[in-house]
Structure formats: C-alpha cells, structure tokens
C-alpha cells in the first residue's frame, strides 16, 4: 500500500474513533429526579434502621429514670456531630441554599462512618431487619456517594472532591462524661437517629426545590 493511502486510512480511522468518543460523551445522564429518588430511598432506610434500633434498645435496656437523666444532662446527651453547624429550626433550614443543605447532609453522613462501627454488638443482637454494622455502613457509603453526585449535578458539573469530615470520634469519646457502656451505646443510637432524621429532612427539602412534583412525598 502506498504511503499516501496508508496515511489517509489512518486519518480516516482516527476521525472515526473521535466521532465515537464524541457520541459516547453525548449519552444522556441519569435524570436528576432518579438521583434524588435513590438518595431519599437510602436516607429513609437509614433513618428507619436508626429509629427502630434505638426504640428496641431503649425498651430492652434503658429504665425511664435513666432516659430522663440522660436527656436532661447536656454532657451525656451531647452528640459528636454537633460540631457540624446545622440549622436549628425550620425557618433557618429554609434559608439555606440547596448546596448548603447537601454539604451539611454529606458531613453528617461522613461523621458516622467511624462511630457506627462501634455499635457492632448492638446491631448484631438487634431483631430489626437489616440492622447489621456492615449493612448500615454500606448504606452510609452509598448515601455519601449519592449526595456527592447530587452536589456535582447541582453545581456546574465540574469534578469536585467535596468536603470531608475528618475529625476523629475517638478523640470525642475520650472526653466523654459517659463511662457506662450501656449508656454510651444508648447515646450513640440517640444521636444516630437524630442525625439521620436531619439528613432525610434536608434531602427532602432540596428534592422539593429541585424536582417538579416531588413536594409532599
């Protein structure tokens, strides 16, 4: 084959490959509504697991006097995640932008990746369906990825790593005034339920603002 013909053939093949790449990048992305549906499904699942496990643990092990004393003492009821600035009421929540609410939700999820593994024995003994430390951790990681994807889509689509919650729960635990293992687990479950409720609420608000017809569901 002549050199000129070979060059022309290679050029044509290169242009064909380029057109394939361009077509591949033009594939439609996952609809925003589906991304929100997936994130909300995981958030609801996490909250339900947190709520059911908390209720089960409280009924089985915590006396009413202990519960009252725990909740009334700001030192024992202090949640590790309270170091994350979150809106304290509905009005302040509504004043936050979509990205702010997603960032807060992301940090709350990341804050539980370490301490949820300390509840291994609690989840192992729980009768709540799906309540194992591996399942809960996987749900947290899945939701972390889902929220990061939503943040990427709601911004300009440029790659980003997102904020990372890198404080250590173990440092907080060493300063804890609660040395009783039973009450320590109770406190973790109390805070886990509280934070998963926040995440679900924040995601629901952002979904309502971003996806037409999604409010109220």
UniProtKB/Swiss-Prot annotation:
Domain of life: Eukaryota
Pfam families associated with the record: Hormone_1
GO molecular function, a single term: growth hormone receptor binding
UniProt note on tissues of expression: Expressed in the placenta.
Subcellular localization(s) per the UniProt record: Secreted
UniProt main location, coarse: secreted
Gene3D superfamilies per UniProt: 1.20.1250.10
Signal sequence annotation: 1-26
GO BP: animal organ development; growth hormone receptor signaling pathway; positive regulation of receptor signaling pathway via JAK-STAT; response to nutrient levels
Sugar-modified residues: 166
Residues carrying Phosphoserine: 132, 176
Classification via PROSITE patterns: SOMATOTROPIN_1, SOMATOTROPIN_2
Keywords, in A-Z order: Disulfide bond, Glycoprotein, Hormone, Phosphoprotein, Secreted, Signal
A cellular component term, taken from the record's GO annotations: extracellular region
Cystines in this chain: 79-191, 208-215
Family according to the record: Belongs to the somatotropin/prolactin family.
Biological function: Plays an important role in growth control. Its major role in stimulating body growth is to stimulate the liver and other tissues to secrete IGF1. It stimulates both the differentiation and proliferation of myoblasts. It also stimulates amino acid uptake and protein synthesis in muscle and other tissues.
Subunit and interaction comment: Monomer, dimer, trimer, tetramer and pentamer, disulfide-linked or non-covalently associated, in homomeric and heteromeric combinations. Can also form a complex either with GHBP or with the alpha2-macroglobulin complex.
Name of the protein in its database record: Growth hormone variant
């Amino acid at each position: 084959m002549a050199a000129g013909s070979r060059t022309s053939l290679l050029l044509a093949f290169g242009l064909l490959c380029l057109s394939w790449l361009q077509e591949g990048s033009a594939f439609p992305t996952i609809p925003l509504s589906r991304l929100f549906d997936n994130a909300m499904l995981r958030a609801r699942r996490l909250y339900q697991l947190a709520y059911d496990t908390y209720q089960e643990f409280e009924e089985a092990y915590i006396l009413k006097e202990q519960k009252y004393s725990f909740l009334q003492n700001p030192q024992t009821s202090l949640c590790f995640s309270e170091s994350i600035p979150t809106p304290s009421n509905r009005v302040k929540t509504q004043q936050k932008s979509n990205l702010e609410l997603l960032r807060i939700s992301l940090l709350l999820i990341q804050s539980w990746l370490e301490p949820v593994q300390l509840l291994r024995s609690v989840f192992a003994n729980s009768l709540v369906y799906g309540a194992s430390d591996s399942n809960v951790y996987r749900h947290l990681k899945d939701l972390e990825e889902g929220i990061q994807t939503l943040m990427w889509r709601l911004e300009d689509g440029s790659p980003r790593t997102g904020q990372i919650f890198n404080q250590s729960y173990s440092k907080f635990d060493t300063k804890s005034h609660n040395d009783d293992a039973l009450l320590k687990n109770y406190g973790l479950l109390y805070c886990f339920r509280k934070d998963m409720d926040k995440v679900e609420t924040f995601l629901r608000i952002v979904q309502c603002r971003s996806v037409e017809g999604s409010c109220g569901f």
